[in-house]
Amino acid sequence: MAERLDPDVVLNHVLVPKHEVIDDEEEIEKILEELGVEKDDLPRIHTNDPVVVALSEKLGKRIKPGSLVKIVRDSPTAGKTVVYRVVTNPPE
């Protein structure tokens, strides 16, 4: 079995952009409406992704499938980019 890393090591790594969990259904619906998409249109992030595991440990609760993860990337060339991914179970 793989050794678990300290969530702060994962979440504060220089190559890992800021991730924020959104699990409030009203907020999710508002975001989807603003983007003009359905949940199924968003890219996915699995519940076993190292960042999702670290966020779960940091928040003290399991991040459930159907939640959104807001990812904010800062780039010297592209500026600030915000993307959303929907949490899903990994394929079996």
Swiss-Prot record:
GO terms for biological process: DNA-templated transcription. One of its GO terms (cellular component) is cytoplasm. GO terms for molecular function: DNA binding; DNA-directed RNA polymerase activity. Its EC number is 2.7.7.6. The keyword Nucleotidyltransferase applies. Keywords: Cytoplasm, DNA-directed RNA polymerase, Nucleotidyltransferase, Transcription, Transferase. HAMAP family: RNApol_Rpo5_RPB5. Part of the RNA polymerase complex. This is DNA-directed RNA polymerase subunit Rpo5. It comes from Methanopyrus kandleri (strain AV19 / DSM 6324 / JCM 9639 / NBRC 100938). The lineage of its organism: Archaea, Methanobacteriati, Methanobacteriota, Methanomada group, Methanopyri.
